[in-house]
Each structure stands twice: as C-alpha cells, then as structure tokens.
C-alpha cells in the first residue's frame, strides 16, 4: 500500500475519496442536476488520477439532507433510476468504479414507510454490484428506515469490498461483520458534522487496525445552513495508519494505492496482531502447550452477543436497564418521539 503517486498497478487498487461540499437541494430537478455535476467530477478526476480504480463520494452528496419531510419523500429515488443511470454512464466513460449515496431510496411500501439511506457500488461497466441500506441510522435526527444486513462483493482487481454509512461506523459490530465476511476494504461514506470530528477520525483508524482491513472514508464538507461538516476524508491502511487524509476544505481529494497481495499476505502470515484469526482461536498457544489441541477456543465468551442472537427482546430490555426505557428524552425532545417525562425549559 502506498501514497503519493497518481498510478495503480495490477496488484494495487487506486482509491480516491472526495470531501464533497454538502448540497442544499429541494427538488428532483435539483438532485438530477447535482448528480450530473458529480458525473463530470468523476471524468475530470480520472484525467488527473489515471490509476483511479474506485472513487467514493460522501453520504448525502447526491441529494443533500432534505430537512423538509415532503421534499424528502418527493425526491426519494428508485434503484435503478435516473440518478444511478447518470452515475453508471460516468463510471463507464471514466472506466472506474464508484460509490454513491442515495438519501433516500424509496421503501417497498413508499409512500407509507420512510425511505432507506442507501449506497450503491457501480462497476466500470456501469453495473450496480452492491446496494447497502444503512443499518443504524443516526437517531434521533435521521428518520430513515433501517436496513438489516451488510454485504461483501468483488471490487476492482478482485478486492473484496463492503459498504457502511456514517453512524454505522460507531458500532464495532458492523465492521467485524463485514471483515468476517471477507471484506478487505470497508468503505465508510459519511455526512458527519461537528462537533464529533476527532472521534470519527479515531474510529475509522481503530477499526482498520482491529479488523486487519483497509478503510476508505468519504465525508462531506461545508455548511448547509444547519450543520457544518468537517471533511477529513481519508484512506487508511490495514495496519491502522493513515495513507492520505483531507483537511476541512470543500472538494478536497485524497488518493492512495491499496495492495491486494499485501493484505492477503498479512492475514495469512501475521500472528500477534492477526485479530480476525485470534478471535476465533482464543488462547491457542496455552491450549496447545496444555495438550488441548492446536485450534484454541472457538466458542463465543461474550454473554451479550449470545443473548442478542438468542433473545433480542431480552437484550433490548437489558440495555434499557442501564440506559432508558423510551426512545425520546424529556430534557431535549426531538420531533414527536415519545418520552416519559415533562419537558424542561431553560432558565
């Protein structure tokens, strides 16, 4: 894995991430116009970065955040649809793969259910090869319908790719799920705003290290009239070290080459920090010395995970005992979310 050049090679996947300026849009026509601008950017980037095999745009980069519910429902997209057709054409023209945000994607029961927050991975032939729906929306603010699974597919040059979105990345479980399915590159598209810049930068680096995987983060930049977005799109090596990172600038771009052979060699041959292997072979050194086989322990030692899988309702009740029993909070109500107390006023 290396950083600083504009090339790629048969062994390296050239990955670019974009600090896309958060748009503020209100209509389908504006969304289509913005999608066309993104398509133009892809073609231009390929000219400047001829080795680019994959370009990643942030969450909300296509549609912005529709703070008006009616606008959100009216602009919700179908997949495939007008937006993905524009992106597919750009990927074919530039001979590159791309990750694009659709906020939202129409629910199967549209308009009776909230839309999904969705990413699509499109290959250089213009084909949609992965569609991921955000599993853990940023409640209480985001009103998206949650997805229910992660995916892994072959990306450029055979690199295994998973997609996750923004707040998903605050939960180690989703990273581990992707990695244990074989993901070598986890793409995290964000529309993350201040004040949580330091925490989000740290999280992506830590998860790359903990899961022996590459991470590509694309985050929004700028101000949309409500939130200020901190950028810092980055490409991180499977050892948790940053290869390239943008600042807070609008439309900043970072680029790095990710070796396919290096990550596979590390996963096969690294020992003390091979976290994926060691998690399912716990204590193999001591057990082998004790005459108890050469595989270590595979059983899950974590009671929480066993409970969650076997009795999700009980797991939910258990977490409410150490947090709260209502989704809303009386001291800081959001929308019409139910809470158990009387709203307090400042002063």
Curated annotation (Swiss-Prot):
Matches recorded under PROSITE patterns: CN_HYDROLASE (PS50263)
Catalytic activity, as annotated: a monocarboxylic acid amide + H2O = a monocarboxylate + NH4(+)
CDD domains found in the cross-reference section: aliphatic_amidase (cd07565)
Catalytic residue list: 59 (proton acceptor), 134 (proton donor), 166 (nucleophile)
SUPFAM superfamilies: Carbon-nitrogen hydrolase
GO MF term (any one): amidase activity
Annotated ranges, domain CN hydrolase: 13-260
Coiled-coil region(s): none
InterPro entries the record matches: Aliph_Amidase/BUP, Aliphatic_amidase, C-N_Hydrolase, C-N_Hydrolase_sf
Functional note: Catalyzes the hydrolysis of short-chain aliphatic amides to their corresponding organic acids with release of ammonia.
HAMAP family: Aliphatic_amidase (MF_01242)
UniProt-recorded name of the protein: Aliphatic amidase
Native source organism of the sequence: Pseudomonas fluorescens (strain SBW25)
């Amino acid at each position: 894995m290396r950083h600083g050049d504009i090339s790629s090679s048969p062994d390296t996947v050239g990955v670019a991430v974009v600090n896309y300026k958060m748009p503020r849009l209100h209509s389908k026509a504006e969304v289509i116009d913005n999608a066309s601008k993104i398509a133009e950017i892809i073609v231009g980037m390929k000219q400047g970065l001829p080795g680019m095999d994959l370009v990643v745009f942030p969450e909300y980069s296509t549609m912005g955040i529709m703070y008006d519910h009616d606008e959100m429902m009216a602009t919700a997209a179908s997949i495939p649809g007008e937006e993905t057709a524009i992106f597919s054409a750009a990927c074919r023209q530039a001979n590159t793969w791309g990750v694009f945000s659709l906020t939202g994607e129409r629910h199967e029961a549209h308009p009776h259910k909230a839309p999904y927050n969705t990413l699509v991975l499109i290959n250089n032939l213009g084909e949609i090869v992965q569609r991921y729906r955000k599993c853990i929306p940023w409640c209480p603010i985001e009103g998206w319908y949650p997805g229910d699974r992660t995916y892994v597919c072959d990306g450029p040059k055979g690199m295994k790719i998973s997609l996750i979105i923004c707040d998903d990345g605050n939960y180690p479980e989703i990273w581990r799920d992707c990695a244990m399915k074989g993901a070598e590159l986890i793409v995290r598209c964000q529309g993350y705003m201040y004040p949580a810049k330091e925490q989000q930068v740290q999280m992506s680096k830590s998860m790359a290290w903990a899961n022996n995987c590459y991470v590509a983060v694309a985050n929004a930049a700028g101000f949309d009239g409500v939130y200020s977005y901190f950028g810092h799109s980055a490409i991180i090596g499977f050892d948790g070290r940053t290869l390239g990172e943008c600042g807070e600038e609008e439309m900043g771009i970072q680029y790095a080459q990710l070796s396919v052979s290096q990550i596979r060699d590390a996963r096969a041959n690294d020992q003390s920090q091979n976290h994926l292997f060691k998690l399912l072979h716990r204590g193999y050194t001591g057990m082998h010395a004790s005459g108890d086989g050469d595989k270590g322990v595979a059983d899950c030692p974590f009671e929480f995970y066993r409970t969650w899988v076997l009795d999700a309702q009980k797991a939910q009740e258990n977490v409410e005992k150490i947090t709260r029993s209502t989704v809303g909070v009386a001291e800081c109500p959001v929308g019409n979310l139910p809470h158990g107390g009387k709203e307090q006023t400042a002063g």
